[in-house]
UniProtKB/Swiss-Prot annotation:
Membrane topology type: Multi-pass membrane protein
Catalysis performed (reactions): a ubiquinone + NADH + 5 H(+)(in) = a ubiquinol + NAD(+) + 4 H(+)(out)
Biological role: Core subunit of the mitochondrial membrane respiratory chain NADH dehydrogenase (Complex I) that is believed to belong to the minimal assembly required for catalysis. Complex I functions in the transfer of electrons from NADH to the respiratory chain. The immediate electron acceptor for the enzyme is believed to be ubiquinone.
GO cellular component terms listed in the entry, alphabetical order: mitochondrial membrane; NADH dehydrogenase complex
EC number assigned by the record: 7.1.1.2
Gene name in the database record: MT-ND3
Name of protein: NADH-ubiquinone oxidoreductase chain 3
GO MF annotations, alphabetized: NADH dehydrogenase (ubiquinone) activity
Top-level taxon of origin: Eukaryota
Higher taxonomy: Eukaryota, Metazoa, Chordata, Craniata, Vertebrata
Protein family: Belongs to the complex I subunit 3 family.
Record's keyword terms, sorted: Electron transport, Membrane, Mitochondrion, NAD, Respiratory chain, Translocase, Transmembrane, Transmembrane helix, Transport, Ubiquinone
Signal peptide boundaries: none
Compartmental location: Mitochondrion membrane
Claim: Cell cycle is one of the keywords in the record: no
Length: 116
């Protein structure tokens, strides 16, 4: 048998064994918690149209902005190998300053305060 066939056989066998074990283990000592589906802390039998706080959305948008900032600043150490490393540093400082000013503005406007 060649290497790929061996790897595929081991993968399928291991997957089947783990799937079988995961179905048998909860049935050994059944419990209401073990037999109920878990939906990220929400009741799966309740209404799906519950009111959703706008603060969650705001925090998610802020997280995405700062995640994007990190993605933009990650290649910065390789920027000193360009023809003009000073220009790269100026642009990255400008992006960082703009996002910092936006965070300060959001903070002073009370957007980060969690109000009920």
């Amino acid at each position: 048998m060649n290497l790929i066939t061996t790897i595929i056989t081991i993968t399928i066998t291991l997957s089947a064994v783990l799937a079988t074990i995961s179905f048998w283990l909860p049935q050994i000592s059944p419990d209401a918690e073990k037999l109920s589906p878990y939906e990220c802390g929400f009741d799966p039998l309740g209404s799906a149209r519950l009111p959703f706080s706008l603060r969650f959305f705001l925090i998610a948008i802020l997280f995405l902005l700062f995640d994007l900032e990190i993605a933009l600043l990650l290649p910065l150490p390789w920027g000193d190998q360009l023809h003009t490393p000073t220009l790269t540093l100026i642009w990255s400082t400008a992006v960082l300053a703009l996002l910092t000013l936006g965070l300060i503005y959001e903070w002073t406007q009370g957007g980060l305060e969690w109000a009920e």
